[in-house]
Amino acid sequence: MSIYDLNAYEVLQTEDLSDLKSKGTLLKHKKSGARVLLMENDDENKVFTIGFRTPPSDSTGVPHIMEHSVLCGSKEFPVKDPFVELVKGSLNTFLNAMTYPDKTVYPVASCNDKDFQNLMHVYMDAVFYPNIYQHDKTFRQEGWSYKLDDPDGELTISGVVYNEMKGAFSSPEGVLDRVVLNSLFPDNAYSVESGGDPEMIPELTYEQFLDFHRKYYHPSNSYIYLYGDMDMEEKLRWLDEKYLSDFENEPVDSEIHLQKPFTEMKEVVQEYSIASEESDEDNTYLSYNKVIGTTLDEKLYLAFEILDYALLSAPGAPLKKALLDAGVGKDISGSYDNGVYQPIFSVISKNANVEQKEEFIRVIEDTLKDIVKNGINKKALRAGINYHEFRFREADFGNYPRGLMYGLQLFDSWLYDETKPFIHMQAIPTFEFLKEQVETGYFEELIQKYLLDNTHGSIVIIKPERGRTARMDKELADKLQAYKDSLSKEEIDALVKATKELEEYQEEESAPEDLAKIPVLGREDISREIAPIYNKELETSGVKLVHHEVETNGIGYTALLFDLSGIPEEKLPYISILQSVLGIINTKNYEYSELFNEINVHTGGIGTSLELYTDVTKVKEKEFRATFEIKGKALYPKMDVLFSMMREILMESDLGDEKRLKEILAMLKSRLQMSFLSSGHTTAALRSLSYTSPMAKFKDDTDGIGYYEVVKELEENFEEKKAELIANLRQIAQQIFRKDNLIISYTSSADGLAPMEEAFAKIADTLHTEEKEAATPCEIHCVKRNEGFKTSSKVQYVARTGNFIDRGVEYTGALQILKVILSYDYLWQNVRVKGGAYGCMSSFNRIGEGYLVSYRDPNLEKTMEIYEGVVEYLKNFNVDDRDMNKFIIGTISNIDRPMNPAAKGSRSMNLYMNYVSAEMIREERNQILDAQQSDIRALADVLQALLDAHELCVIGSEEKIEEQKEMFLEIKTL
């Protein structure tokens, strides 16, 4: 029997997706009208997604709050948080839900057939039969609610989405993205914020929330996607019999309307908050935005990806260079958003000034006119096409399942025309078309039509306002106080009662019989086998080579690892500057823009990084190895070009180019500032660990706050510091880029080894051979600071860290289970559910470093108190066998992620450099699979050791940090 014999469905379309080694089928469920798309192939990492078109009508965030809420219990799975139960106890390779400006999607992935079916079941039940109709507590917890602990207390607002969006609105980049979208589409769903504006979220009522679900969460408005190696007939039958056949086809008005084009460009000015001590000079964002056709034009969809590369994204691209040369901003970037119905092309200048607006527009338009008149750089176009085609063919999405990313891309057309779901999956003919157009004037015509003649655009200015956060907080507090003052005693008592009831609901544990309904695997479903390690030590041209032999589809993945021992502590930031500079600065034979194009015409790209390794057999010595790594990938016949370009970058870069160095420092400063607002939790944890860990101090000095402080100092005092900077860069390059300082990591199939060895032989003896100073071990000095960093953010990132091995507690595999237990039980319940933070996590590694962190957290003192309570929680840890199994399975899920060829090679090399043997991994896996509750209780000592270290760092709002100033040894503005 085949899917054609299933009477419940009508087959509308089939496609041979040979480039993706898949067969595509589009169906419609006859009774309910549900749209279904299958991608059949031999990928064991199966994906299921159900999505809904959910255009918002206001900025109350109802699509986002709904996305959170439906995963908080359903008809068949009435536990309070089935999502967390699945995270804890499934072998998922992806499990999440996402709200977009016009859709909400619920994807899951797993390699285990039984687990995959369980995930599908819970998600289908969640979206169609959520418990949101039973009571309003989920809405109040995930969305918003008034919080009043006692009649005389302060009235506040809490809610997970509310706090998440307060964090999102604290970032100028977040403000910019939102205002650009809103500015271009005043008459459709893109005019409002689907995630929710914190000022508007409290306008949403419970009844409006339920109405949104009734309207949009119906099979007639659904898009169901199945990908991978599975019995599609069985899945389709199950979907029909279990869910879809319960519904009749209903008309659902969820159409995304096209915005009528503007007759002239619009201008929008919006403020964002900076800390009271920050300068408002060079802190404005300017954005030039144009609407580019629709996402249903597959040629345009890819052509502007290429133009984004050629005009803006590549180092030295003409728009970027023109704006930098004109001094309009210090960090120029491009953005091409083709994930909405009408894609948006943006030119963004960061660290500019408001009065530069006219110059910004003039430089962009004059540069574009010149490009149209004299022609675009053809090599840049070819490089852009090759870059995107290489990525399409390689299909390396890092940690994300391939099928997940294909599914999300399907929505780029399927959502707007249900007859065209596959147009972006068949990209090779489009790439061939674009290659043929390079010399025809096609791309110049696109620039003229869509960027110069097109009046459907906007200029967006995001400018700083000192103390805006404090002012808005005061306005909200005054508004809430006025509201409270207007209430009768009975109404105030009702608020106190509602607050208490929500807290009691959050304290309640789900009934054991309800928890038992969540399907879980047993330990017996898990293999004790570890993933293979692919390390074979060889020698090539007098250099150690570690070969990772796996099937790579004809691509060779190369990394040159240069040892950094002997670089003194005060020069560590300069290593990172060198790493950032190489590849985007002129070389002897290429201007940096041409260098980048040459690389991307012939290869899959070259990048650099700094990595840290430690001998896990000698953790008490606290010794570690730092390496400067240059990595690249290319097809085997292009290995000689790859190595030639690597050598060009390492040996021929012009490290004395003052103008370019100044531009790069400004860009680095801007991007580090951004990362503190988007990834403040990792920044805070690293900084806190650096108080006592030499390895963490190295990392902070090269990638954290310590590094930022040096970059900022160099950028702001460039004229007096430039000679020292250049001398350091040259000296470090000469000291490290040497054949006697090198190990090579190479991932390929057996037949890819010879081309690599031949290519490396041509450059091996051209690395530095000058006599170098005798290297002395780098001594790193750690200082305990316990810092609070004030920012313009409305939320906190709270980190508590320590080293448990220093206090005599050994590492065990059970600590990996503890990460799951804390992150999805103790911390989740207390920091997220009750505290309202968007995220919380923990980590413990083989060298004894541990941390507890919160993310976009409205609290500070309360979170620290929760951290202090973790030891008592562990001492009293007591769950049934089923729950214990769940924690173990969730732990294995984090370990057993499917790996692409590049990941198999890099994992193997990582184990090699850290001296981790197969026996150690096997022992850790057995410790996880054999763990008992007593093993978890014994870990109270680990947490006690961590807390006894008294190391903490907080990045957050001025107000909260000043309120708790006695907590810190130092308070600074970031």
List each model region and its residues.
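Hydrophobic, small-residue-rich alpha-helical packing segments that form membrane-like cores
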Residues: 150-219, 225-243, 247-275, 280-282
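Active-site His/Glu-centered metal-binding helix of metallohydrolases
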Residues: 62, 66-70, 578
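M16 family metallopeptidases and their MPP-like homologs
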Residues: 45-55, 81-129, 136-147, 174-199, ...
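Non-catalytic terminal extensions that flank enzyme cores
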Residues: 1-47
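Non-catalytic, conformational "gating/processing" segments within enzyme and secreted inhibitor domains
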Residues: 158, 210-242, 704, 726-760, ...
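His/Glu-based metal-binding/catalytic segments typifying zinc-dependent metallopeptidases
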Residues: 40-42, 49-51, 162, 166-170, ...
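Extended, regular secondary-structure scaffolds
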Residues: 211, 223, 232-251, 374, ...
